[in-house]
Design a protein with these regions (language model features):
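Extended amphipathic alpha-helical interaction segments
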Residues: 155-243
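N-terminal Sec/ER secretory leader and immediately downstream segment
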Residues: 34-148
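Bacterial signal peptide processing site
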Residues: 27-31
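Bacterial N-terminal signal peptides that target proteins for export
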Residues: 2-14
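A cross-kingdom marker for long, charged
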Residues: 229-305
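Secondary-structure edge/capping motif, primarily at the C-terminal ends of alpha-helices
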Residues: 109-116, 135, 139, 174-177, ...
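C-terminal motif of bacterial Sec signal peptides marking the signal peptidase cleavage site
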Residues: 22-25
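Non-transmembrane, amphipathic alpha-helical segments
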Residues: 90-97, 109-116, 120, 148-151, ...
Length: 305
């Protein structure tokens, strides 16, 4: 890839690679004719209900790409000093450290791609590939998938739909191969990194009417999903330890007020249809913000060290 390509080309190239990582063994088994593989599995009704519940939890979390897009739309600017240096990749030798930092690096890659950082994207592609390969979840993307992405090179919404769909397939692949703990740690790493990047760009003296602060406080809602996901996989000692770490953040978020505003009734253009409107309102004090930023920074730095 040329460093002089247009921003749209850089974005699509990065998305192809993010897709490559997140399909995690799914896309490589699909051909242009969409061949189907059949499995015969005996599941009780309780097992099926458990599987659907777990999938609902995994799918409720934003992908690293969605997190990066939310950061940018909330007013974040590019700051490479906030990223986990790619030189650290050789440190990650355990399943826990590799899974957490796969989530972290994938979020870094998404963030860099949205700000058109060509060389940085290539560096993070390599680091992410190494971790995914070491975890045994790397597979090739077939030519049909790449063609679909290239056909929509200038349509970020379509690209996001494709990536999000296959991010869910990634979680399914890990679950169906009894690797839910790896998926849980990977998703938690990405969640923490998104919060860390947002916190790193907010001045504690400018909390009022700040879109990034709104993004940060809204994380309280998705944290409930993260904690439930970790609880469901706490039979794994690595996940149990991670859950204990995340409880520190959960305790701080209890001090953050997030609620829905009163419902307002307005008329549509038709005047025969009433439209109900409500917004999420949040508030965080300076002291709580400081505590949250300090705790998240310490925890995230322990993940990447």
């Amino acid at each position: 890839m040329s460093l002089n390509k247009a921003p749209a080309g850089l974005f699509a190239s990065s998305i192809v690679f993010i897709f490559f990582i997140l399909t995690s063994g799914c896309a490589g088994d699909c051909s242009r004719q969409q061949k189907e593989r059949e499995f015969t599995i005996d599941l009780s009704e309780d097992s099926i209900e458990d599987l659907m519940r777990v999938k609902k939890i995994f799918y409720s979390l934003p992908s690293p790409l969605e997190t990066a897009m939310l950061l940018k739309s909330s007013g974040a600017v590019y700051n490479e000093e906030l990223l986990n240096p790619v030189e650290n990749v050789s440190r990650y030798l355990t399943n826990r450290s590799m899974a957490l930092n796969l989530g972290i690096y994938t979020t870094n890659l998404s963030y860099a791609s949205l700000f058109d950082q060509a060389q940085t994207c290539m560096d993070y592609m390599d680091a992410t590939r190494r971790l995914a390969d070491n975890l045994g979840i790397l597979d090739a993307v077939d030519s049909y998938t790449i063609e679909r992405l290239e056909e929509n090179i200038n349509n970020r919404e379509v690209i996001l739909d494709i990536v999000s769909e296959n991010f869910m397939n990634s979680s399914s692949f890990l679950q169906e191969n009894n690797r839910e703990p790896v998926a849980a740690m990977m998703l938690t790493g990405g969640w923490i990194e998104g919060l860390y990047l947002a916190l790193g760009q907010v001045d504690e003296n400018e909390l009022e009417n700040n879109r990034l602060v709104r993004m940060i406080t809204d994380k309280k809602l998705s944290l409930e999903i993260v904690m439930l996901m970790l609880e469901n996989n706490s039979h794994n000692s690595d996940v149990a330890d991670l859950k204990a770490d995340m409880e520190k953040i959960e305790n701080i978020f209890r001090e953050v007020d997030v609620h829905s505003s009163p419902v307002e009734v307005t008329q549509s253009g038709d005047e025969t249809v009433a439209v109900l409107r409500s917004a999420t309102v949040s508030n965080i004090s300076r002291d709580v913000f400081r505590q949250l930023k300090s705790t998240v920074t310490d925890l995230r730095n322990s993940f990447v060290s």
